[in-house]
Amino acid sequence: MTLCILTASQKSHALTAHTINIIVGSKPKVVDITAAAKKHGFILNGVFYSSSTHNLSDTNINEFDGFTKLSDFIIKNYTANDLDNSSNYDDAEGDSISHSQPFAVGQTIYQWFDNNGIRIADSDKLNIIGCGSGYAMPLTLTITTSVKTYSEYGNPNESEAVAITKLYKIASKSKLCYAKPYSTESKSGYQWVGINSADGYNWNDPNFSQPNPNNGGGYSVDYVPNWGYKANPAASSGKIFPTTGFSGAKFQLVMTGAQTDYEFSIPVNPGGNVSVDDQGYITLNDKPTGAVTINAKLIRDNNIVHQYTFDVTRMWVVPHNGKYTYDQAVQICNGQDNMLTMADLSNSPRSYDYYNLTSADHISNSYTRKIGDSVFGEWGWVTKNSYPDSNWREDPIDTATFSGRYWTKEINKTDSQWGFVVHSHDGYVVSYSFRLIGSMYNSSYANVVCKK
């Protein structure tokens, strides 16, 4: 066995197995960590992204489609092939890198954090990063691997473990996604209804998402369960939610990421009757005098401003407390012309076929969640409970005492002692006697809602 101690001037000379068997000195080192870390990355939609491949920035925010799930980012396992035997190895005594095992690479570990430094749990990995995710942007993806290197002849020949870590800033592309009626949140279990074969009601049942031509129910393609209406609807003939309104009506503009990533304001507010808070909740306090525009400015980039314009001047309604006869309703509304039609309140098929209310296929009925053609169809379950700042009736204790029945202006042509009411929670349209004919539903008395 030969012991060779090199001076600094000798370090540059090549050492081979012919001249030395063991070199006693310092440990070898893994070097140029910054360059090595650039090879950390992920595969998304079949494309490998990393700093080293120049399609992923390590200094700027990288934006991806908001419908991308965290689980769609397939983190690449770091291997010895990602290290260079020359540039990532150093030995103070000039010993060469081991031929049999140049590097030992540990497990690749990654974590996601939101912009507040809160770690995103593994159970959330199936969540999308965009619309309504609630994640403060940008996210930070941290990828790390422990690496050691080995010299050919050194004693010791194993380096200290070095962490090769890379951080990438990931964000969803900024977007205004949905306009969510407050009832979607406050009465989330009662967003849409379907009429089953037993003439009963099924709430939030996916089997009844399609509107029935005889009974109504379901929702249009513009309504997304749990999120509300699409900000850019496709089936509303260009109408934007809401097109109807009442004092205390409330909805939220749902953005990509966290609501706190945006600053909300109202640059156009004719009449000054609309307000917005820092979470993007818009409240209609009274009837605007024209179209209202809301701005949502991305705080991290003030050049990105989303605008949302709506107009509720076409149909503004005013509900009144108490139960009244039809004649009293006419007086409260200052005339029959200021009362609402069935079709104004509900887009149930019965609203357009109200003289056929007792046919076999026209028993139970309800609204369809849709933009543009009725108050209850747009706003959903409409009571004081679902819109706390409104003047609608409260939810009932039980069905028999339900008080949210609102007179419409129509009178039955074949029997002038019968009118019609619409239920505010489900859009149910039914004929209603002007005379007291029973105690269960307290016929002859109903609630009043007027136009403004």
Which residues are covered by each model-predicted region?
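Acidic, serine/threonine- and proline/glycine-rich low-complexity repeats
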Residues: 3, 7-276, 285
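Short, flexible beta-strand-to-coil junctions
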Residues: 109-116, 299, 411, 452
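Short, intrinsically disordered, charge-biased short linear motifs at domain edges
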Residues: 117, 162-164, 318-322, 436-437
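Short, structured beta-strand segments at or near domain termini in extracellular proteins/domains
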Residues: 189-196, 200, 204-211, 219, ...
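Extracellular adhesion/carbohydrate-recognition regions
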Residues: 227-265, 269-345
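Conserved hydrophobic ligand-interaction patch in extracellular adhesion modules
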Residues: 316-408
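Extracellular C-type lectin-like domains
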Residues: 375-452
